[in-house]
Amino acid sequence: MTHERATTRPAPAALFLGFFLGCVLVAATAAGATCAGTPGVVPSADGTPIAYEVHGGGEPTLILVHGWSCDARYWREQLAHFAARHRVVTIDLAGHGHSGTGREDYSMRSFGEDVRAVADAVGGDRLILVGHSMGGLVIAEAARLLPGRVLGLIGVDSLHDLDFPVTEEHAAEMIAPLEADFPAACRQFAAAMILPDTEADLAEWIQADMAAAPAEVALSAMRGYMAQWITGAGPALFEELPLPVVAVCADLWPVDAEANRRHMRSFEAIVLEGTDHFLMLGAPERFNRALDEAIAMIKP
């Protein structure tokens, strides 16, 4: 485990992979045992039903938000560990998992509204928001909507470099294959972020599961996500938040801590060497220890 691995910038395609896929934490298993939670459904600001589960007890509350074309199941290896000491809330964002569909624009702001709706439903004013990949931007949107209730943000293989330049041309290049053949392109997209030595069944499940996502939801979310970086709205969002940010990242892409600190109140990074984008599934024990460390950095 190392801290603040700031090096040269990656190629645009590689960064997009790092920024993008994602799944915000939590589902239901550890060491083969199921950790049952209390389910709920709450309407988001636009009326879309948002499914969530509450596990365990204890403060601060962890709200775990998945990323692009994923859902709460991607965090099954975290539930038993963290629910022993925290109240853990898992969410399916609109268009994912058990939550409703039909939204015209799956924007990052609308996903932030989903998180706010769940936070209001479960209550509490000592929240730590944890977001994987795309979820890193979603939790920033949510924190803006929850003033005074959020202690800090934790990005999981997310928020590597807020200053990385993203252009409309780069975004179009990323989206075009997904528009042409979503299942095949999505499998390739996921496979590029999985290490070759990953257990075969896990690697296949991730690729098949993400490729089965609704294409209209995935494409809308990707366009919305890219727009935040093209316009600069993503970095600007963090400038509005008086919150500490910690990233727990794989070592597939470098972290530019100094770039992030230009936009964030504070930023620290924990890098797990030899892991990939789905480190919470592929290296759960190491990841859980790192997330414990990140929580300790934030918790007053």
Regions found by a protein language model. Give the residues of each.
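Conserved HGGG/HGGXW glycine-rich cap/lid loop of the alpha/beta-hydrolase fold
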Residues: 48, 54-98
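Conserved hydrolase catalytic core segment
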Residues: 124-164
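Conserved alpha/beta-hydrolase catalytic His-Asp/Glu region
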Residues: 163-169, 180-238
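Short N-terminal helix/helix-N-cap motif within the alpha/beta-hydrolase-1
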Residues: 72-80, 98-101, 137, 164, ...
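Conserved serine/cysteine hydrolase catalytic core
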Residues: 212-271
